[in-house]
Amino acid sequence: MKNWKKLLSLCLALIMMLGLLSACGQEPTETSEPPADVTDAAPADTGEEAPAVEDVYAMEGSVTIAYPEGETAEIQPVLEAFRAQYPNIEVVEEPFAGSESGAFNEYLAQTVAANSMPDLMWLDWNDFAPEVASGFVYDITDLFFSDPESEYVPSGMTDPYTYGGKLYALPCQMNAMGITMNLDMLDELNIEKPGYDWTMDEFIEIVKKGITANTVGAATLEDLDNVYSAQAEGWWYPAYDFVNQKFDFTNMWVPAMNRLAELRAVPGLEAWIMRYPKLEDDTTSLDSEYVAKFGEAGKDDNHYTFKNGLALLCTNATYNDNWMRNECQVNWDYWPYPRVDENTPTYTPIHVDCAYLTSTCADPEAAFQLLKWLTYGVEGNLQRLDIFAARSDGEFAGETTTLLKTWFMPCTQHPDVVAKFSENPNVTEGLAALYESLEYSIRGDINKVIPGYNNIFNDEVNALLNSVRQGQANAADVAPQIDALVNAALAEQLEAFNAKVGE
């Protein structure tokens, strides 16, 4: 594929130079690079038909793809579209039980032992670093970055899958974190609908307006501290400098946590904090402030007040969209997280499942075409968006109670894809704004990509974090201890990981 592109460019360059020679009587100047617009130029009629870009669809090959069997209804129409576009690439499907934690790692280990690894893995939501360290994954650096369409993929979506300067995976299913707003309550309380580029000051003003005798401003502000510990270029949440591979809770998390603590100190602002202190079994006491205001209904459901019209907003994520559509008794929509101030963008946290080629992939060129189709490719995304847009809200996946997805968030910011996403009748104005905010995306699920995450954020560290969130300790007092614990553990995990990758 690359060879004929080079041949086309050289032929066109020669034709143009000959034209200059005949017109001006000058010797053509030798050059090693074709003009910038050569790939868009129409070839001269030489009697021979030049290869067309569409010839990539004539590529031959065979690809075996493995995916969680619970996602069959979602992926099969997308694979059928690929087969129609690439009729000479055989796609063999291998569904497997991939719904449990560690299922992907276990499946790969089993197929390695049987010498039968698939060529492509799709929708891996497990810890990815161990798969790289085990040598299960193919380096796609050259395949990806030599493709012009790769420039439309924000670096925040590929950086997490880059180890030792090599890219090993691509995001294939993405969910964004943001705010969900009760549109009915906005009207009832005569609150002006905020813009999607709102600031933290506007957010605070609005959430306070949601406090009445019967309602709260927020059902939950969970994750607000994590999100605002990473509102800067080069950071993931919580408070992780991924360039220097170091956590900084003291300088990044403390200010964010202090802001959250101030909001939670406002009487009646957040239902979540009204449940604390909880009982030893982690249930809400009947003597709690929550029960005093709302009764026992939903006392242990963090989103109950939002679902039932008793809260103006809540922090949320699109991975909750399925049950939100099923259970919410109000009209609602998404908003991006507010900007820190008017001079900064919103760095929207994303949760991502990935897809990748395996190290035993027999035909990387053909397999990469399918990988591209399922991840960032423009044509694959446009066709997949059409497939999802054609669905009606309320359709279930097979015999399950799971609703079919009526939209998905593409992992590219290509203008054609962005426009197509917004045209979907199932995509609301707020959801479109949330998707557009992904130009500046940060990872909110670093447990999937940082080696040994669970050994870093162990019970001791989580207890320290929760003591602050529940109002039992001060962030500034606890943060240095957290930094010392997590950075020491991180250094140990990185050393072990890098040693294994380098073997």
For each feature predicted by the language model, list its residue ranges.
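C-terminal lobe and pocket-closing loops
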Residues: 324-328, 343-349, 357-459, 501-502
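Extracytoplasmic "Venus flytrap"/periplasmic binding protein-like
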Residues: 81-155, 187-190, 303-313, 326
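Short, well-ordered beta-strand elements
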Residues: 54-70, 89-95, 119-120, 168
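Helix-loop-helix "hinge/cap" segment bordering the ligand-binding cleft or interdomain interface
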Residues: 84, 145-146, 162-283, 359-365, ...
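Extracytoplasmic ligand-binding clamshell segments of periplasmic binding protein
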Residues: 99-103, 220, 235-343, 347-348, ...
